[in-house]
Amino acid sequence: DIGTTKIVAMVGEKNQFNKIKVLGVGKSQSLGVHRGVVNNITQTIQSIKIAIDEAQAKSRIEIKDVAVGIAGQHIRSLQHSDYITRENPDEVINNDDIDKLIDQVYKLVMLPGEEIIHVLPQDFKVDGQSEIKEPIGMYGSRLEANFHIVVGQVSSIRNIGKCIKSSGLQMGDITLEPLASSDAVLSFEEKDAGVALIDIGGGTTDVAIFKDGIIKHTA
């Protein structure tokens, strides 16, 4: 978690209940980040190393690969609808069909200097039948979906990647921080009923809004 005021590294493992057991946490003062954006590579690398070293010492586990949270003023979101025409409508819709549709959305052209971070399906439509949450197993030739798309500046994402790599680590998944926070603190019932998660940080405040178990808005 590369924040404006502090950098936090956490080591955890899944237990038999599919919950994360925290094995070690490291923290350091963040000196090279402003409003969620890296503005000093050298200072950020130093802060990352301090947090990682502390997390390794407490967990007694060597850290090589990390998942990174991303936020900041360069992040924006938008709504988009798209569809595919299935090649085999006599077969039921499967994960490959959904992946094909999502991959198609990832190819959308954003503004210069931007790239897509997340493509999040909200609901589906099969041959005109709308408001479908789970289309897998259904028959249909035209598969449509509404998407919530999260976009960030390429330069900001690359700067984070450089800091991670220069700290001797490999960067895995990048996740929008309010989405990661929502998975950690919100229940399915809360997301289904409707809830707004507000993450107040040292330099930015992030929001994620859910309704009917679907991500509706991020900011």
Spans of model-derived segments:
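A cytosolic small-molecule/anion-sensing beta-strand core signal
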Residues: 211
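A structural feature that tracks compact, well-ordered secondary-structure segments
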Residues: 206-208
